[in-house]
């Protein structure tokens, strides 16, 4: 067994961020790892950057897609080749800000065999590195189940989960362009327990180029369908549906335009009163 923890890091044309993500994985106190970097058909210097690190650290493997497969397919491909008992997620524009992140999560899963997934808190920064917000997610399995239809209760790049749970749940749904993680967590909840450490372990870059911000309307529509799909498995469906419906309405072009105009007018009003 090479690496009790397999870190799966998909990347596509983000060489400027990739180095920091790689280094945050390699600098973990927990050393029994393998780092699988799935290069999703990048045509830039991504492969060269990976090769530089792989020269000095044999725990790194590049998995190169000949054509772009997208996030869900890339994740499944990486996990299929993973040799570890546990899978950790990391994105190319995020980094782990706690060197003991894996150590803490492995210890939790090793001592709580009934749990299959453990996440943690997240810090969001802008492209200049300024902190925008930090937050913790619901902690216990009971708390998570109460809110899982309201919003995604895990930061994707904070999680550690059992590989056999991923296999038993059927992996990431490759038909989803958004929220593939949220969908998987809801399937995980049907076969085991879920938990969030109350600590900040990952720093997430929030930019206008993030996948989940690229098509807000499509994402909102998909999230409504996810809530319908799992309404019999978790409580508070109607509350979650109304939250999702509100998000969908706000994503409509005319509403988005009116909201932008309103915010712009409020800004002018505040300036004029100074």
Could you tell me what each predicted segment is?
Residues 1-216, 270-273:
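Nucleotide-sugar donor-binding/catalytic module of glycosyltransferases
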Residues 200-207, 213-238:
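Catalytic core of nucleotide-sugar-dependent glycosyltransferases
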Residues 165-174, 205-208, 225-227, 242-254:
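Short secondary-structure transition/capping segments
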């Amino acid at each position: 067994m090479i690496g009790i923890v397999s870190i799966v890091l998909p990347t596509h044309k983000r060489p400027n961020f990739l180095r920091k993500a790689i280094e945050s994985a390699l600098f973990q106190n927990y050393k029994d790892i393998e780092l699988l970097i799935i290069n999703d058909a990048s045509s830039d210097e991504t492969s060269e950057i990976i090769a530089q690190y792989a020269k000095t650290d044999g725990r790194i493997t590049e998995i190169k897609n000949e054509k772009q497969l997208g996030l869900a397919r890339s994740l499944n491909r990486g996990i299929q080749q993973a040799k570890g008992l546990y899978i950790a997620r990391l994105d190319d524009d995020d980094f782990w800000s706690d060197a003991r992140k894996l150590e803490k999560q492995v210890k939790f899963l090793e001592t709580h065999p009934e749990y299959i997934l453990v996440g943690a808190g997240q810090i969001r920064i802008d492209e200049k590195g300024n902190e925008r917000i930090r937050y913790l997610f619901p902690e216990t399995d009971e708390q998570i189940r109460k809110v899982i239809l309201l919003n995604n209760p895990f930061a994707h790049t904070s999680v550690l989960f059992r590989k056999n749970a991923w296999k038993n749940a059927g992996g990431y749904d490759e038909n989803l362009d958004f929220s593939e993680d949220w969908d998987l967590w809801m399937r995980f909840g049907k076969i085991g327990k879920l938990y969030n450490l109350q600590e900040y372990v990952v720093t997430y870059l929030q930019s206008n180029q993030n996948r989940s911000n690229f098509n807000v309307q499509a994402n909102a529509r998909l999230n409504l369908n996810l809530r319908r799909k799992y309404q019999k498995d978790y409580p508070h469906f109607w509350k979650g549906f109304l939250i999702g419906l509100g998000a969908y309405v706000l994503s409509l072009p005319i509403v988005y335009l009116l909201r932008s105009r309103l915010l712009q007018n409020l800004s002018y009003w505040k300036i004029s009163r100074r």
